[in-house]
Amino acid sequence: MLQNVTPHSKLPGEGNAGLLGLGPEAAAPGKRIRKPSLLYEGFESPTMASVPALQLTPANPPPPEVSNPKKPGRVTNQLQYLHKVVMKALWKHQFAWPFRQPVDAVKLGLPDYHKIIKQPMDMGTIKRRLENNYYWAASECMQDFNTMFTNCYIYNKPTDDIVLMAQTLEKIFLQKVASMPQEEQELVVTIPKNSHKKGAKLAALQGSITSAHQVPAVSSVSHTALYTPPPEIPTTVLNIPHPSVISSPLLKSLHSAGPQLLAVSAAPPAQPLAKKKGVKRKADTTTPTPTAILAPGSPASPPGSLEAKAARLPPMRRESGRPIKPPRKDLPDSQQQHQSSKKGKLSEQLKHCNGILKELLSKKHAAYAWPFYKPVDASALGLHDYHDIIKHPMDLSTVKRKMENRDYRDAQEFAADVRLMFSNCYKYNPPDHDVVAMARKLQDVFEFRYAKMPDEPLEPGPLPVSTALPPGLAKSSSESSSEESSSESSSEEDEEEDEEEEEEEEESESSDSEEERAHRLAELQEQLRAVHEQLAALSQGPISKPKRKREKKEKKKKRKAEKHRGRAGVDEDDKGSRAPRPSQPKKSKKASGSGGGSAATLGPPGFGPSGGSGTKLPKKATKTAPPALPTGYDSEEEEESRPMSYDEKRQLSLDINKLPGEKLGRVVHIIQAREPSLRDSNPEEIEIDFETLKPSTLRELERYVLSCLRKKPRKPYTIKKPVGKTKEELALEKKRELEKRLQDVSGQLNSTKKPPKKASEKTESSSTQQVAVSRLSASSSSSDSSSSSSSSSSSDTSDSDSG
C-alpha cells in the first residue's frame, strides 16, 4: 500500500490513508472519513512539525567528551584508586542516581540550566573517562568531581533535596580521597597479544555503531523523518563481518538498536553506556578479548585512539582486584623469593586471626574501616601533634604485613596490635568525632569474631598427657603426706610444670610441622612423668585410690550424722582422711596454673576460705606454713558439683573484671561450652548471671581466672586472701572456729563436753595430728555465719591452741 504514496503527492488525505494501510478509495467521503481527518493536521505541513523539534534538540548540548586521541592519558595508582574505590563507593550510594548521567534540561524542563551551568559534569562521564584512561593525573579527575558538586550547589537552592544528596556524596568523596595514595606513580600496563588486531576490528565495529547512534541525534520528530532511517540501520549492523569476535549480548544489543533509534531519546549517550556495561560483564567472566572490544568509551571516539586504549584497559582490570600487587613490584626479585620461602604454616588461632583481618579489610566493612587501612599521614592531614600524642601508631596494613611476614607468634600479639590501633584513635580524637564512632563499630566486628577464637590443638595438651600416666603416679601425687619438705618441693615442681606448660603453648603456636609437635609432646610427657615420680618418692607411701575414694564418698554421705555424734567421731574421721591433705594445695596450684587444662587428673583446686555448703574447704592455718592457700576437695566429683558461696561469686566477678581484654573471649567460650542455654547467644551481648550458672561452670571460670591473674604476678595472688592477716589473727580466727564447733557439740552432747577438749589437746600434741586441727578448722568454716561465743568455750579453745 505504501507504493500508492509518492513524496510529491498533493493530496494529504490520500497520503495519510496510504500510511494507515487503507486503499485510495478509503480517502473518499464516507463513514470512515473521520479517521483520516484526525491525522490530517499532522501531515498538513510536515516542515512545520519538524521546525519545533529542531529548535528543541539543541537545548541539550553534546555531552562532555570521554576520550580524546590528541590528549594523552595514563594509568596511575591514584587514578586507579579513584576508579576502583572512590567511584565504586559513590556509584552504589542510594543518593547517586541523579548524578549518574548528564542533566537532561529538556526532559526536566530546565530551559535556563545550560545558561547558568557552562561546564556540565556527571559521574557517568567521569566513570567513562576513567575507563578510557582519559586523565593524565588524579587532580584532573578530582576537578571533575568538584565541578559536578559545584554545579549542583550553584543551580539549586540550598534547601533542595538534591543539594543534601550532593553534600552527602561529597562527604563520602572527601573521606575516600583522604586515604588515597600520597604519591602518584604511573602503573606499567602490559599489552596482551593480538590486541592490535582486535583493536582494529574494534575500530571498524565502533565506527559502524557510532554511525548508527548518530542517526537519532540528527533526525527530526516528524513522521517522515522517523520512517527514513529504518532501512539503513539493519544494513549498518549487518555489515559487521566478525561474529566470532563479538559476543552474543553485543549482537543482541545491536539488533535491538533499530527500534530504540525510532524513539527520540532525551539522552543519547546513555545507550552506548548500557551496551558497554553488558559486554563488560561478559568479558569479566571469559577472556580479555571481549574486554578489548569494550574499551572505547563513547561513540564519538575516533578509531585511531581505540587500539591503544582497548589494549591498556584489561590489565588494569586484573590488577584492580589485587591491591597488594603494586607495592610488591617495587621489591627486588630476590626479596620476593625470600618472602615467599620464609613463610611457614599458621597455627589454627592465627589462621582465625588472618580471617578476621581479611574481614576487616573487606568491602563489607569499608564504609567505616577505611580510615584504618593505612598509616596516619600526619603531615598530609595537618596533624602536627599526632606523633607527640601517639607513640606507637598502628593500622590494618601494618597488621596485614606483620601477619604475612609471620611476625605474630600467637593470637594475643595480633589482638594487641588491633586494639592498639583502636586505642590510638580513641586517645587522639574527641569522643564525638566521626572516626571514633567508626572505630567503635569496627571494633565491635573485631571483638565479635575474636570471641569465637578456636582452641589451639596443643593448648589442652596437659590433659591427655596426664591421663596417659600410670594410675599409681597420679594417685600418689594426690595422696602424699603432710610434711613441710614435700609440700615445699612439690610447689617448686608445680612452678616448673607451669613454666613447662607455658613454654609448650608458645612452642606449639610457633611450631612449623607435625613431627616437631609430636617430638615436643613426647619430651614434655617424659618431663611430667619424671615430676610425678619425684612427687611419689617424696610422699610417705600411697594408699590405693579406689578404696580412698569410696571412703571419701561414704564420709561425705555421713557428714551430718557424724557431726551429731560428737567431736571424737570427727577426730577419727579426720585421722582417716588426713593423708592426702597437703598435696591438694599443690595440685590446685598446678591446675590453676595450667589454665584448667589438667585439673581433671591432677586434682581439682579449691578456692576461697569462705565455704558455701561443703565442709571441705580448709584454710591452712598451721604456724609452720601460714601463707599456703586454702585448697583441696576430697574428690573431683565433689569439687565440680560444690556450689559457690556468695563471697566466692563476688570475688570471681571482681577477678573477671580485672582480666585484660584478650582474655575475655575465653571466658565467654567457657560459659557457652558448659551452658546449653547460652550456646546460641551473641558473645557481644551475653549477660553473665552467676545465680543461673552451674557450679561446674563457675569452678571452671574460677580456675581460668586464677590462672590468668596468677601468671603475671605469680606469688602476690597466692597470698591474696590471707593478705594483712598475721599469725596472731590467724590464731584468733582459728579460736573462733573451734569455739563455734565446741558450742555445736556441747549443745548436742552435754555429757561429752570434756572429751573434745582432751581430743583437741591430743591433736595438738603431735606433728602428725596438726593436720587434723587444720582439717577441723576448715570443716567448721561453713558455720561462719554464726558469731556468738561463750567465755568458757573460748578458754578451752585457747588452751587447746596453745598446746
UniProtKB/Swiss-Prot annotation:
Q: Where is this region: Disordered?
A: 1-28, 53-73, 268-349, 456-653, 739-803
Its taxonomic path starts at: Eukaryota, Metazoa, Chordata, Craniata, Vertebrata
Question: Which gene underlies this protein?
Answer: BRD2
**What GO molecular function annotations does the UniProt record carry, in alphabetical order?**
histone H3K14ac reader activity; histone H4K12ac reader activity; histone H4K5ac reader activity; lysine-acetylated histone binding; protein serine/threonine kinase activity
Kindly provide the name given to this protein in its UniProt entry. Answer: Bromodomain-containing protein 2
**BP term (GO), one:** neural tube closure
Residues in Bromo domain copies: 74-180, 344-453
Q: Name one GO cellular component term.
A: cytoplasm
Q: Does the keyword Cytoplasm apply?
A: no
Q: Where in the cell is it found?
A: Nucleus; Chromosome
> Which PROSITE patterns does the protein's record reference?
BROMODOMAIN_1, BROMODOMAIN_2, NET
